[in-house]
């Protein structure tokens, strides 16, 4: 509901501009700024005139029916249903033969980085660098990767990527012999999963070798896992 619920953090993110009068032109200027900014994030690239015209046509329909906020809501519905938002599109460059390797654009690289490291959209800083065709520069790329890894959103690299790579969801299907492991329960299962995630995170945060996943002489345990391993004093 675009008009209910009062001010909330999510509404504040969307409604960064508001008309101060009933003038249609002022409302459309605000709508253009709002929709254009959100489309740039959602499409993960600069927004073309055609992109904006299409989205504003939905805004005008909604605004004519129920006012400014309803118009923004209708434009956002169209934005979120767009293939440009739902799919990560990488177009072959003109003149490249089928099957030939080619360098992806900086904007495509920005999307790959953000979805890999954050499982989310690129932020404004990453998009700005990519739009300026500077992201492929080694020093700039390293700076952006380090910045992204220091961001709390990089936690998803531990919880999602590590889980997928190491098939941690398969733990849910494991049912050890209850006669040999009578104390095995879901708390222990969750402890094993978190142990692996924290080990992966420590390797990433401390710049250790990936082989530490196999050779590390340390780990992370809670009381339940420590008891299972026979580790005293925890």
Where are these regions (language model features)?
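Low-complexity, glycine/serine/threonine/alanine-rich intrinsically disordered linker
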Residues: 1-234
